[in-house]
Amino acid sequence: MPKPLAGLRVLELARILAGPWAGQVLADLGADVIKVERKGTGDDTRGWGPPFVEGVDGNHIGSAYFHSANRGKRSIEMDFESEEGRRIVRKLAARSDVLIENFKVGGLAKFGLDYKSLAPECPRLIYCSVTGFGQDGPYAKRAGYDLMAQGMGGVMDLTGMPDGEPTRIGIPMSDIFTGVYSVVGILAALNERQRTGKGCYVDTALVDSTVAVLSNQALNYLVSGKVPKRIGNAHANIVPYQVFPTADGYAIVATGNDNQYVKFCNVLGAAELAQNPEYKDNVGRLKHREVLIGKLSALTARMKRDDLLEKLEAQGVPAGPINDVEQVFNDPQVIHRAMKLDLPSDAARSGSIPGVRTPIIIDGWRAASERPSPRLGEHSAEILREIGEA
């Protein structure tokens, strides 16, 4: 099938992660994404290793980090400091449907490449700015990074054990969510352009996105006025829904209703816990969380993990293992869903560059570009020819 975004032209003036992530998702969906990189050095993340992808000549062709967010793009080197470079970028913008940038607020204005400067000559352009704090407000001028957003957006205070320190989530979630929300905003703006014929400005921010995904914890506070506390691997609103010890490791048990709780107790041979009126519903189980979890944990700790999971599965109780990353990519479900990519590359010593596809399937088509991440300036001559600048 033709890719959903085939024919869409995207100009990416972004580096690091949030902006490039948005560009990669659009590329996976079929857009032609041109990544404009600083002459000589390119995206900073090209050097964020090890590990690096080894090239055919023994030198590396970019860090694993860079390759995680730049699949499917074409790269052109450009010097924004020169008038010639700025002219080329403006020419590329004029033929693009979407522009993504993640400079600090006002950072592109000095080059005449901000939305206000480009809009008159590119009236149909969807211009998306990705920043730490957004285009306005008391923090707008500050630089923003994922770790800061996780902290300032409340996620770190909610993550970790109750008696431990606030904890960063193990992936750059604020960057990634902002990239995904940017794609949502861009697609909404493109739909609006079909109606009006005009482009528009999309403003996304790391802290905004982090606050947005506080989800139930945000509403727990806004409704009750009580500040949520860290509860480790448990759930703020559901009991039992957490990690339990087993005789040989740990298992996740995620009961979502009273019936599943009763089945969990039956698997453990603890009918008395299922019948106890203090635990008959989630309100009671929340009230008596500490005592109940202590009793359940003592029982799960006697069972081997796989035996517990097998019995829970047979009873229809949601449960699962805690996988490390190697186990993730060896998991039969992940393999079946073809999440891992191996993209042919003449530049890589192994002949291919690995990746992880965008998790969208449309009528059986899995969203993924066939093109690996580009070498710095790999497509400069090709792109210049396309705009009559060769």
Please describe what each predicted stretch is.
Residues Q135, D163-M173, Q194-T210, K229-A236, ...:
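Conserved Rossmann-fold dehydrogenase catalytic segment
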Residues G179-G199, A212-S224, C265-E272:
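Oxidoreductase and adenylate-handling cofactor-binding alpha/beta cores
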Residues M1-G185, A189-R195, R375, H379-A390:
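N-terminal helix-loop segment corresponding to the beta1-alpha1 unit
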Residues G40, F133-G134, L206-V211, D248-Y250, ...:
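Glycine-rich beta-alpha junction loops
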Residues P2, S345-A390:
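Flexible, small-/acidic-enriched active-site or ligand-binding loops
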Residues V239-Q315, A319:
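Aromatic-enriched alpha-helical interface/lid elements that frame and gate functional surfaces
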Residues E313-R337:
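Conserved PLP cofactor-binding pocket of PLP-dependent enzymes
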Residues D57-G58, F66, I231-A236, Y241-Q242, ...:
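Short Gly/Pro-enriched turn/cap motifs at secondary-structure boundaries
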